[in-house]
A protein has these predicted regions:
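A glycosyltransferase accessory/donor-loop signature
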Residues: 2-144
Length: 144
């Protein structure tokens, strides 16, 4: 009988020689197991975009009405309250139609998030919020 992909993954993860060459355990193992078994589909089914691109002076936003699935990459996600950009609107629209529609967007819960929150606040012309979040960032870095 053919070994299942899950069993192969567990077996490979138990092999120290294989694991020593992996950077991202789950992704790398799947890439090895599925090598040659993958069908590449149109990018509209996995459009990747970082909301931190919004911090740049200029960037190309690949999100449009043709996109089926957006994979928000990077530390800032559309469920963060500081991700207030048109590029986050597909998520907000889906959230509003979901059982989580009344849940608040996430506030910064660690120093890394506080730093990104402050950067986005300044980009969005919210300097008071930016200063407050930089103070919070330093508090989390120094005190905690």
């Amino acid at each position: 009988a053919q070994e299942s992909d899950s069993a192969k993954a567990m077996s490979m993860l138990a092999d120290k020689a294989i694991v020593s060459h992996l950077t991202y355990m789950d992704q790398d193992i799947l890439n090895l197991i599925l090598l040659g078994k993958v069908k590449f589909i149109d990018a509209k089914y996995n459009t990747q975009f970082s909301l931190n691109y919004e911090l740049k002076k200029s960037f190309v936003c690949p999100i449009n009405d043709e996109i089926v699935l957006i994979h928000y990459v990077g530390p800032t996600k559309p469920w963060h309250y500081w991700a207030s950009y048109p590029s986050a609107q597909p998520f907000i629209k889906a959230k509003e139609a979901s059982p989580w529609k009344n849940e608040p967007l996430m506030r910064p819960v660690n120093s890394n998030y506080a730093r990104y929150c402050a950067k986005h606040n300044f980009k969005q012309n919210k300097p008071i919020n930016g200063i407050m979040n930089y103070i919070y960032y330093f508090y989390l870095k120094i005190i905690k």
